[in-house]
Curated annotation (Swiss-Prot):
Domain comment as written in the entry: Ncore is globular and carries the regions required for self-assembly and RNA-binding. Ntail is an intrinsically disordered monomeric domain in the C-terminus.
Protein name in UniProt: Nucleoprotein
Biased composition (Polar residues): 503-517
Annotated Acidic residues bias: 448-461
Domain of life from the UniProt record: Viruses
Entry function: Forms the helical nucleocapsid (NC), protecting the genome from nucleases. The encapsidated genomic RNA serves as template for transcription and replication; encapsidation by N is coupled to RNA synthesis. Forms the encapsidation complex with the phosphoprotein protein P. Before encapsidation, the newly synthesized free N protein, so-called N0, is chaperoned by P.
Alphabetic keyword roster: Capsid protein, Helical capsid protein, Host cytoplasm, Ribonucleoprotein, RNA-binding, Viral nucleoprotein, Virion
Gene label: N
One Pfam family in the UniProt entry: Paramyxo_ncap
Ranges where the record places region Disordered: 448-543
Chain positions recorded as RNA binding sites: K180, R195, Y260, Y350, R354
Length: 543
């Protein structure tokens, strides 16, 4: 039997790696469009600024073909290079298009009519056609300009610093819309605005050169449709991943925004590795996971064999991205997502709800994370020289913090006084919020996660949601027959000063603590945890 399992493991790995054998046939060369790219050999900032604005208008134009927009994008992304012609050789590596570099010496006056080099084969009719394309700006752009400020195109950029400020600001906005151009092109604008605000705060985008949202959308669609541009951007990203800390300003910005592009479209795979395998919790020993664990092992080897370009599979539109889809390992994915929702607040923004999400294994991950949050990794503990007492103390500390935030991994409630081990009852009969201690007499926090008590929690929460509360006798009396107390939080009345409101809150907290201590003294079975008994109400009412 063991030989069969070993053969199955080798078969699974080989199945993922067989596409990379040396005898794989080379695909046939397809028909490639001719893309004309305008370049300048001069470092004149005014000329380069005019070429940038010209390329930007070609991308925006209503009458421009896809090849026109692709050439304008390549020219625009090459403007920071001192030798544009040499830099464009990166684009010639792409099997998608043929590049025709056209050198220009300037523009006629303040117009967008290019002046080709004497060696160029560009005709006068083509020059006039490009000028007409640049002037055909869509009506959806305000003031017939891509920029929010209408006077940007009329500005003078005679100094190198002014041109670089304009160039870097425009290119950074193009890089920002590239981040999700393949995986989520219709994402809400708020995600783009957050990154825009980040780079404005860092001084990498000048607010004067902000593009209109419609202009950014057009640029994103143009990049999405032009594979040769995405190939070129991938080479740029690889050059930006320099091992040295000394880099020019442009590639430092490219390397920073490239972190949003890396592993795009592979969030499910890496989250499964991080939360499912990285935690190394005993639940992985389930027999149902054995086959998918072999699959994940094969996929990790498969990813390593793809080389440094594997990080940009979504940007490159690679079919190999489908190999890493979570549908290939649904149980491990569901289990990992359950863990992630408990231990990582960032998972709230991740849309993990898929048709292949298994609810049972998702809940298994949730319960495992709640129970194992105080677990200690034995190998790390051994490296740190932790004793058994240290492990117990660490687990107890984490358990106390978890209970103080609502119990069993729940998020803290809005009411700052609602953290007493989740003993929060939504509303009393009179509409005031209150705490019910009588329902928790039999609570034993040493066995906090027992199935019996979990059922008690569910019953308690269900009754609280339905507004029925518990037994009237318990609702009217505290623990040990103590008289009831109004636990409604004081509200700040209009015109009340800060000192008066603070005094009311202090008095309220003192009454709550006093009532809670009296309730503990009258408890018949001592059903509260040792930490609360030792510290009074301070452990549960942490103000």
């Amino acid at each position: 039997m063991s030989s069969v399992l070993k053969t199955f493991e080798r078969f699974t790995i080989q199945q993922e790696l067989q596409d990379h054998e040396e005898d794989t046939p080379v695909p046939l060369e397809t028909i490639r469009p001719l893309i004309r790219v305008f370049v300048v050999n001069s470092n004149d900032p005014a000329l380069r600024a005019q070429l940038l604005l010209f390329n930007l208008r070609i991308i925006m134009s209503n009458t421009a073909r896809e090849s026109h927009k692709t050439g304008a994008l390549l020219s625009m992304f090459s403007l920071p290079a001192a030798a544009m012609g040499n830099h464009l050789k990166l684009a010639t590596r792409s099997p998608e298009a043929s590049i025709d570099r056209v050198e220009i010496t300037g523009f006629e006056g303040r117009s967008f009519r290019v002046v080709p080099d004497a060696r160029s084969t560009m005709s006068r009719a083509e020059v006039l056609a490009y000028e007409a394309i640049a002037e055909d700006i869509p009506d959806t752009l305000n003031h017939k300009t891509p920029f929010v400020n209408a006077d940007v195109e009329q500005g003078d950029y005679d100094e190198t610093e002014g041109f670089l400020e304009l160039c870097y600001s425009v290119l950074m906005q193009a890089w920002i819309v590239t981040c999700k151009c393949m995986t989520a092109p219709d994402q809400p604008p708020i995600s783009i605005e957050k990154r825009m605000a980040k780079y404005q705060q860092q001084g990498r985008i000048n607010p004067r050169f902000i593009l209109q949202p419609e202009a950014r959308r057009i640029i994103q669609n143009a990049i999405r449709k032009a594979m040769v541009v995405r190939h070129f951007l991938t080479y740029e990203l690889q050059m930006a991943q320099s091992k040295t800390l000394l880099a020019n300003r442009y590639y430092a910005m490219v390397g920073d925004v490239g972190k949003y592009i890396e592993h795009s479209g592979m969030g499910g795979f890496f989250c499964t590795l991080k939360y499912g395998l990285g935690t190394r919790w005993p639940t992985l020993a389930l027999a149902a996971f054995s086959g998918e664990l072999q699959k994940l092992k094969a996929l990790m080897l498969h990813y390593q064999s793809l080389g440094p370009m594997a990080k940009y599979m979504a940007l490159l539109e690679s079919p190999k991205l489908m190999d890493f889809a979570p549908a290939e390992y649904p149980l491990m994915y569901s289990y990992a997502m359950g863990i992630g929702t408990v231990i990582d607040t960032n998972m709230r923004n991740y849309a993990y709800g898929r048709s292949y999400l298994n609810p049972q294994y998702f809940q298994l991950g949730v319960e495992t994370a709640r129970k194992q949050q105080g677990a200690v990794d034995h190998r790390t503990a051994e490296d740190l020289g932790m004793s058994q007492a240290d492990k117990v103390e660490l687990a107890a500390t984490l358990a106390k913090l978890t209970i103080g935030q609502g119990g069993r991994g729940r998020q803290p409630l809005d009411d700052p006084f609602a953290g007493a081990a989740g003993d929060y009852q939504g509303a009393a009969a009179g509409g005031a919020q209150g705490f019910d201690y009588a329902s928790r007499r039999v609570r034993k926090y040493n066995d906090y996660e027992s199935d019996e008590e979990a059922g008690m929690d569910d019953d308690y929460e269900q009754e609280a949601r339905e507004g029925r509360g518990y037994d009237d006798d318990d609702a009217r009396q505290g623990i040990g027959g103590q008289s009831g107390f109004d636990f409604s939080v004081p509200q700040r009345a209009p015109g009340m000063s800060d000192e008066e409101f603070q005094a009311q809150m202090t008095k309220y907290i003192q009454h709550v603590q006093q009532h809670y201590q009296e309730a503990q003294e009258g408890a018949e079975d001592g059903g509260y945890n040792q930490t609360t008994d030792d510290q009074g109400a301070g452990g549960d009412f942490d103000t």
